[in-house]
Design a protein with these regions (language model features):
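N-terminal ligand-binding/catalytic initiation module
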Residues: 1-156
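Short, exposed beta-strand "edge-strand" segments with a Pro/Gly-rich flavor and a Y/T-containing core
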Residues: 22-27, 106, 110, 177, ...
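Short beta->alpha junction loops/turns
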Residues: 26, 110, 137, 161, ...
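Glycine-rich, charged/polar anion/phosphate-binding loops
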Residues: 49-54, 199-200, 240-242, 261
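Glycine-rich phosphate/diphosphate-binding loop of Rossmann-like nucleotide-binding domains
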Residues: 75, 82-100, 158, 162, ...
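Short, well-ordered coil/turn residues at beta-beta hairpins
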Residues: 134, 257-258
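Transmembrane alpha-helical segments of multi-pass membrane transport proteins and ion-pumping complexes
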Residues: 139-142, 198, 258
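Rossmann-fold NAD(P) dinucleotide-binding segment
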Residues: 144-151, 242-251, 261
Length: 261
């Protein structure tokens, strides 16, 4: 069976999708139902109204994450739109549940602007204990994350930035140890200067890396480039003869590929 058919069958059978919602309490008797819904449900409502922190006692808020996207940077596929990104968001939800027993709602937002996206997330945030931003294109992803962290009182995590950066840093630490090399002495070349690339490079710099060259589809990021934004301008090198990926790879110790294609 080829990969395409196997993947489509996996998502289609025995029922469409990868997620379902199940009750965590017994719902077999009339008494159970009267506690799960009216009239019994009024009691936790009143307790939460008196003290909002009680939501963590009487609801699933503390173990419920929203995996949220606008579908503008889906895997290596690019801007696929909100609806087409749903299988990826369901897949991330499965990982949360399988490896951490964290419950997830996947949410795909059609938003014309970053501010519209932000306001939508702010409006639904009371439901959740945390927000996982996923597959949002750079540079808008940086603005969205920054604004949500300012506006919300729950954790906001952008997986493509911070998740990727942590994994890359861990792998590189081990690889350098095997090679008996030091982070501050190696030359590191990134292909890709979007959300993942910038976040990885910034983390490695904070850990002591001194020689990092970023390359995107237009070549090496240097300070003569006129199209840099606030997130990658601090990663640009001084103008030099290094202009292409081939130039950058001369005597490189580490290559990290985080480009869209």
């Amino acid at each position: 069976m080829d990969l395409k058919k196997a993947a489509l069958d996996y998502h289609l059978f025995p029922k469409p999708g990868k997620l379902s919602v199940e009750s965590s309490k017994p719902c077999l008797t009339q008494q159970d139902l009267s506690l799960a819904y009216t009239p019994g449900v009024a009691e936790p409502v009143k307790e939460i109204h008196k003290d909002p922190s009680n939501a963590y006692k009487y609801t699933n808020k503390g173990n419920l994450i929203a995996v949220i996207t606008n579908g503008t940077a889906v895997l290596g596929l690019g801007n696929m739109g909100a609806l087409a990104s749903k299988p990826v968001m369901e897949g991330k939800a499965v990982l949360f549940k399988r490896f951490a027993d964290i419950d997830v709602f996947d949410i795909e937002i059609n938003a014309k602007t970053s501010d519209e996206f932000i306001q939508t997330v702010v409006n639904i945030a009371p439901t959740f204990g945390g927000i996982n931003l996923e597959d949002i294109a750079a540079p808008e992803c940086f603005y969205i994350e920054k604004e949500l962290k300012k506006k919300l009182d729950i954790p906001v995590f952008h997986d493509d930035q911070h998740g990727t950066a942590v994994v890359v840093a861990a792998g590189l630490i081990n690889a350098l140890e095997i090679q008996s090399k030091k982070l501050e002495e190696v030359k590191i070349v990134f292909l890709g200067a979007g959300a993942a690339g910038c976040s990885c490079a910034r983390l490695l710099k904070s850990m002591g890396a001194r020689n990092i060259i970023m390359v995107d589809r237009q070549g090496v990021l240097d300070k003569n480039r006129s199209n840099l934004h606030e997130i990658n301008i601090d990663l640009a090198i001084e103008p030099s003869a290094i202009k292409t990926l081939d130039d950058a790879m001369q005597d490189a110790d580490v290559f990290i590929g985080v480009s869209a294609a």
